[in-house]
Amino acid sequence: LQQAVEVLKQFSGRKFDQTVEIHINLGIDPAQNDQIVRGSLVLPNGIGKTQRVIVFAKGDLAKEAEQAGADAVGAEELSKRIKDGWLDFDVCIASPDMMGIVGPLGKLLGPRGLMPSPRAGTVTTDVARVVKEYRAGKVEFRNDKGSNVHAVVGKMSFDATKLVENIGAFISYVQSIKPNSVKGTYIKSIAICATMTPSVRVSA
């Protein structure tokens, strides 16, 4: 892993700070509901940017979300902004009583991976904690149809040690949520890359 990060950092001569991603190919059958791999974790060193977080909530929960640093908080009026084409955010959180308002936005939010979900922890009554976690660098992922999971793990400007810590934490977390029904090799391959670089394989 250390070698892979050092190889990747040799490509860093671009004028902007490239985002570093991890791609893991899994030995799962994505058509089976009991083999879906999804989750979220706060990386030890963040991801190098403050994520823009919006929250669907009312009353006290709305106040808590605002105090925690949410970029936008609301209900019907927030839904209308999204329906009108506003999607300038990275994370969408909702309190459970707001799902009646959020549900119809699924066609807009779902394809972008922004739909709040109880399994991902983005449908919650503890909105303040979740807002703080995402602003601190929490990443969320779900396997795609090709049995891959992808996530941002930092920036090229990070020290190699910090990238290694983030990538190691992500791999360990993915290993820890292996579905019980998966037989054979679970992690088939791991690669890291940045915005403008080739992929570098990591030994699984």
Kindly label every feature range from the protein language model.
Residues A70-Q175:
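Long, charge-patterned amphipathic alpha-helical coiled-coil/hairpin "stalk" segments used as oligomerization
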Residues Q2-K63, D84, D90:
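Translation machinery proteins
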Residues A4, A65, G110, I192:
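Residue-level signature of catalytic and energy-coupling elements of molecular machines
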Residues Q51-A70, E76-L78, I101:
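Ordered, amphipathic secondary-structure segments that act as subunit-interaction surfaces
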Residues V5-F16, P30, V131-K138, I171-K178:
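Structural signal for hydrophobic packing residues in well-ordered secondary-structure cores
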Residues I24-L26, A57, S95, V153-K155, ...:
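Flexible glycine-/small-residue-rich
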Residues F16-V20, I177-S189:
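Flexible, glycine/charged-enriched surface loops at secondary-structure junctions
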